[in-house]
Curated annotation (Swiss-Prot):
Stored SUPFAM superfamilies: P-loop containing nucleoside triphosphate hydrolases (SSF52540), RecA protein, C-terminal domain (SSF54752)
PROSITE patterns named in the record: RECA_1, RECA_2, RECA_3
Protein function: Can catalyze the hydrolysis of ATP in the presence of single-stranded DNA, the ATP-dependent uptake of single-stranded DNA by duplex DNA, and the ATP-dependent hybridization of homologous single-stranded DNAs. It interacts with LexA causing its activation and leading to its autocatalytic cleavage.
GO cellular component: cytosol
Organism: Shewanella denitrificans (strain OS217 / ATCC BAA-1090 / DSM 15013)
Lineage: Bacteria, Pseudomonadati, Pseudomonadota, Gammaproteobacteria, Alteromonadales
Coiled coil: none
The protein, known as: Protein RecA
């Protein structure tokens, strides 16, 4: 059926008016691959960068990463910090859980000598530190670990068992209103790690929710749901996790994509394994039987050996990475480059129904 030209003209006019009033990218077609022209930082996972649509996490925005315990939330943020530091950016880690392991961070490539770290006593103190760092304009990436550990001062000073209904949610709501504008002006990326809780009495739908009230869900430009889907074994020994990340909210590109990758204990995201898998999928790396080859040269028998070869030859790994990014982040990239999420999702908050 042919579209009404008057309606098309009216739609184009109102879309132009909305973008002029609220900013480019405030409205787009769901299937569009066009992304907002924003600076991004890689997540350390090529498949996740592709799922995000813009090549990484956006600067000047709020990002929420949530999931169950030991799913890889902190590992993912440390990978982002390492990537930012390699670009010469200044990073800060607000360790409200008092659980940051500097040895592990160093193994992931974080320059711990130049990483700003704070272990605040109260939630208000943590958020004030975030605001001060943001307003300085000198810090590029701030990670808060975690929202659940941001305890209001009144709760800390009170007795165990006292009721403090809504205090944390009110604190987060006030902080979001204050931080959002400052982050945009200073072009600072603020990442909140969050935990999952269960709603009581939910009979139908997803009973899971995140801590800290609803404000963060609405102010976040990107929300990532990270889950451990399986174990990676070397013989009988478990050496890592199979991980799936769902982009449940995305204001800079089409949302509802997902990425799968491996997190190896003590090493972080298995980048070379991703390069081998994506290289084969997009015909940059040839596979014949168990042998993998690149540009006619054999690089290993079996996925593990091919990945090891790329680790030992970073120039070749970087070449494959660059070619894949050009292919997958291009506007003409194939649709299957990032899988769609099947769940019914609230388009405003990214919550699953």
């Amino acid at each position: 059926m042919k579209a009404d030209p008057n309606k098309e003209k009216a739609l184009a006019a109102v879309l132009s008016q909305i973008e002029k009033q609220f900013g480019k990218g405030s409205i787009m077609k769901l299937g569009e691959d066009r992304t907002m022209d924003v600076e991004t930082i890689s997540t350390g996972s090529l498949s996740l960068d592709v799922a995000l649509g813009a090549g990484g996490l956006p600067m000047g925005r709020i990002v929420e990463i949530y999931g169950p315990e030991s799913s890889g939330k902190t590992t993912l943020t440390l990978e982002v910090i390492a990537a930012a530091q390699r670009e010469g950016k200044t990073c800060a880690f607000i360790d409200a859980e008092h659980a940051l392991d500097p040895i592990y961070a160093k193994k992931l490539g974080v320059d711990i000598d130049n990483l700003l770290c704070s272990q605040p006593d109260t939630g208000e103190q943590a958020l004030e530190i975030c605001d001060a760092l943001t307003r300085s304009g000198a810090v590029d990436v701030i990670v808060v670990d975690s929202v659940a550990a941001l305890t209001p001062k009144a709760e800390i000073e009170g007795e165990i068992g006292d009721s403090h209904m809504g205090l944390a949610a009110r604190m987060m709501s006030q902080a979001m209103r204050k931080l959002a504008g400052n982050l945009k002006q200073s072009n600072t990326l603020l990442i909140f790690i969050n935990q999952i809780r269960m709603k009581i009495g939910v009979m139908f739908g997803n009973p899971e929710t995140t801590t800290g009230g609803n404000a963060l869900k609405f102010y976040a430009s990107v929300r990532l749901d990270i889950r451990r889907t399986g174990a990676i074994k070397d013989g009988d020994e478990v050496v890592g996790n199979e991980t799936r990340v769902k982009v449940v909210k995305n204001k800079i590109a089409a949302p509802f994509k997902q990425a799968e990758f491996q997190i190896l204990y003590g090493q972080g995201i298995n980048r070379t394994g991703e390069l081998v898998d994506l290289g084969v999928a997009h015909k940059l790396v040839e596979k014949a039987g168990a042998w993998y080859s690149y540009k006619g040269d054999k690089i290993g028998q079996g996925r593990a050996n091919a990945g090891r070869y790329l680790t030992e030859n970073p120039a070749i790994a970087q070449e494959i990475d660059t070619l894949l990014r050009e292919m997958l982040l291009n506007s003409n990239a194939p649709k299957e480059s990032a899988a769609d999420v099947d769940d019914n999702v609230d388009p405003e908050t990214g919550e699953v129904f």
